[in-house]
């Protein structure tokens, strides 16, 4: 598989430091408001990327953080709670972290390896800052804040391809008392009365944003790890500053091999913003459309390109999802009508879609082409395979169905055909019991188990001593 690396501006062969283990970190939300469709695009892409790596045989350790203390959270708490904000500010991140898990579940995003929170790692961050001060890469300002000295790190700007002189002239950096350089950034922010704080050797305060992600990613994944991701808006200054901190702390050029960024999402040609009043929340969209339709809508655009979000696109994706389910449902039910041997080479033609599907994902995660191949296979199943089902063996029909489901699993669609977790172990146990009953020629009881499972939507397919099962909603 080849993937575009923002650090090198090239599409590169994907390799990992540890064979068959892919370690990655994706910057998570600052939980101070509702998630919007731009957030969804980022997390769905990395979920598809993770699923494809797993299909290739990798164990994937994906870490996603929560920045659960930040100026935005503090300001939101003041708006909602007034003078009680100091006591109740934690209610804000808790509320929106809960929403994160609710929305990602509806989007069928698989759970991460870890979800570290800033507030649970402050002690580690203080230790990092102490080390950076000792090494001469950070300095203490008169108010007790600690700043990272950008000029001390060679090749600053390597990720965003900008020079320090240009950044100083045009960077969006607010001047702060105690800074030696406008580009220097806070590792530790001194306490403001009425706001949350933690102890440190310098003053009461809280950690800075850029430091937080470096500490949490390397704590869970080690350094260097394989890939670091997020939205394209994080390239500068956030990811640039992460690289600078890690260079100073570890003495390595890059603490992540691949930097992967997802393009902007626009509404009517403009980025979403509160001032324009064009923010579309995930809750709003998922109250009207399925998570699978939204996943397909995201996947119809290449992850690195800007994506224009429209409800027309979402309806197109919804219609596509219906076709995908029709192919699955009808082929699952038609398996019983398959013949004993193959009379036509339908499987070879069907599996060409799978070959093209995986070829597209191998080529820098080209999900638009992958979606078209999955959709093409669905249409082929409906238009051709089902009409000639009696001319292929049941095993061949099941091979086609399994490959189709395998492709859908990578994109995270057809998820509603999955056996509910609370049923899955029971089904497996009943299939094993039924196999023993068949061996003992207790066919009446074996047939009863098949019948009862069918009533739950679980269809059993016997091929000699082997039994496969499919699930219908």
UniProtKB/Swiss-Prot annotation:
Motif 'KMSKS' region: where in chain: 271-275
Binding-site positions, Zn(2+): 27, 213, 238, 242
Catalysis performed (reactions): tRNA(Cys) + L-cysteine + ATP = L-cysteinyl-tRNA(Cys) + AMP + diphosphate
EC numbers on record: 6.1.1.16
Intracellular or extracellular location(s): Cytoplasm
One GO term (biological process): cysteinyl-tRNA aminoacylation
Motif ('HIGH' region): 29-39
Cofactor(s) recorded in Swiss-Prot or TrEMBL: Zn(2+)
Residues annotated for ATP binding in this entry: 274
Cellular component GO terms, alphabetical: cytoplasm
Main location class: cytoplasm
First-tier enzyme category under EC: ligase
GO MF terms, alphabetically ordered: ATP binding; cysteine-tRNA ligase activity; zinc ion binding
Entry note: cofactor: Binds 1 zinc ion per subunit.
Keywords: Aminoacyl-tRNA synthetase, ATP-binding, Cytoplasm, Ligase, Metal-binding, Nucleotide-binding, Protein biosynthesis, Zinc
A Pfam family it matches: DALR_2
Alphabetical list of HAMAP family matching this protein: Cys_tRNA_synth
Family: Belongs to the class-I aminoacyl-tRNA synthetase family.
Name of the protein in question: Cysteine--tRNA ligase
Provenance organism: Pyrobaculum islandicum (strain DSM 4184 / JCM 9189 / GEO3)
Lineage: Archaea, Thermoproteota, Thermoprotei, Thermoproteales, Thermoproteaceae
């Amino acid at each position: 598989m080849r993937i575009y690396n923002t650090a090198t501006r090239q599409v590169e062969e994907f390799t990992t430091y540890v064979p068959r283990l892919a370690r990655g970190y994706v910057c998570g939300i600052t939980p101070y408001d509702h998630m919007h469709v731009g957030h969804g695009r980022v997390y769905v892409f990395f979920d598809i990327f993770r699923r494809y790596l797993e299909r290739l045989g990798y164990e994937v350790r994906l870490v996603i953080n929560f920045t659960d203390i930040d100026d935005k959270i503090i300001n939101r708490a003041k708006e909602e709670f007034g003078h009680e904000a100091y006591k109740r500010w934690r209610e804000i991140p808790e509320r929106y972290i809960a929403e994160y898990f609710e929305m990602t579940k509806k989007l069928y995003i698989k759970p991460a390896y870890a979800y570290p929170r800033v507030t649970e790692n402050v002690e580690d961050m203080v230790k990092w800052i102490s080390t950076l001060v000792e090494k001469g890469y950070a300095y203490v300002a008169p108010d007790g804040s600690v700043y990272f000295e950008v000029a001390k790190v060679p090749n600053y700007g390597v990720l965003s391809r900008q020079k320090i002189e240009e950044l100083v002239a045009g960077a969006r950096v607010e001047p702060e008392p105690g800074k030696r350089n406008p580009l220097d950034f806070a590792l530790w922010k001194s306490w403001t009365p009425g706001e949350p704080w933690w102890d440190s050797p310098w003053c009461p305060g809280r950690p800075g944003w850029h430091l937080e992600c470096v500490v949490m990613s390397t704590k869970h994944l080690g350094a260097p790890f394989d890939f670091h991701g997020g939205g394209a808006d994080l390239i500068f200054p956030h990811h640039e500053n992460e690289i600078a901190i890690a260079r100073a702390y570890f003495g390595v050029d890059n603490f992540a091999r691949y930097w992967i960024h997802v393009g902007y999402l626009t509404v009517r040609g403009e980025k979403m913003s509160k001032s324009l009043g064009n923010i579309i929340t995930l809750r709003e969209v998922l109250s009207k459309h399925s998570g699978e339709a939204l996943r397909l809508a995201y996947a119809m655009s290449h992850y690195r390109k800007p994506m224009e979000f429209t409800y027309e696109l979402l309806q197109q994706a919804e219609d596509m999802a219906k076709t995908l389910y029709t192919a699955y449902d009808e082929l699952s039910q038609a398996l019983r009508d398959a013949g004993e041997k193959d009379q036509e080479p339908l499987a070879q033609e069907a599996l060409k879609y799978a070959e093209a599907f995986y070829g597209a994902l191998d080529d820098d995660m080209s999900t638009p082409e992958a979606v078209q191949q999955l959709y093409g296979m669905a249409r082929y199943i409906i238009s051709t395979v089902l009409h000639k089902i009696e001319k292929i063996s049941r095993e061949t029909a099941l091979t086609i169905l399994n490959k189709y489901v395998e492709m859908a699993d990578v994109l995270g669609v057809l998820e509603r055909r999955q056996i509910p977790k609370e049923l899955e172990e029971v089904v497996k146990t009943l299939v094993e019991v039924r196999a023993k009953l068949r061996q003992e020629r207790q066919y009446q009881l074996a047939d009863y188990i098949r019948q009862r499972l069918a009533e739950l939507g679980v269809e059993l397919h016997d091929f000699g001593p082997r039994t496969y099962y499919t699930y219908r909603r």
